[in-house]
Amino acid sequence: PLIMTRDYIDRSLEVFPLEFLEMKLIHQLVYGEDVLKNISIGKADVRLQCERELKGKLQHICQGYIKAMGNKSALTDMFVGSLSGYFPEFHGILFLFDQKLPKEKGAVISAVENLFDIDLGVYKKLLEIKSQDTHPSAESLKEIFEKLYRVLDTLIKKVDEFEIKPA
């Protein structure tokens, strides 16, 4: 649970737009006024944070892939461990393009796939590995890395090319 004042939220929206977008999407009000209901999240702020986060994730998987030196357990842990961190960016991308923001992870993946006509099956594969606690082969992990790299590169370009239209 988080406790925040309206002033704190207002002063933090441009710094943490993805976090507030996620909170607005999934929060449950326990008591008092719903201060997240009418917050205004700027597309320019979301675009910037999405690009920064996606580029950071691309660096992370590249560095992690090299650092793991073929260790299947380390690679699996890195890929599966970082999985949930992609969904705020996916929500941000959908927000930028005025799409519905699904809560269920499979639906989020499908929405981004449909938006850009790209294959995000690698994320579905990672969800499957996580839910079934499986241990992929070295070849499968190499394919996962290559697919993640290509998908992230494509998403970064899409976000980078997104134009903020004046109000």
What are the residue ranges of the model-derived segments?
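Short acidic (Asp/Glu) and glycine-rich catalytic loops that position anionic groups and cofactors
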Residues: 3, 33-34, 86-89
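Conserved nucleotidyltransferase catalytic core and NTase-mimicking acidic/glycine-rich helix/loop elements
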Residues: 40, 45-167
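Alpha-helix capping at helix-to-loop junctions
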Residues: 18, 25-32, 56-63, 67
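Conserved catalytic core of two-metal-ion nucleotidyltransferases
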Residues: 1-31, 38
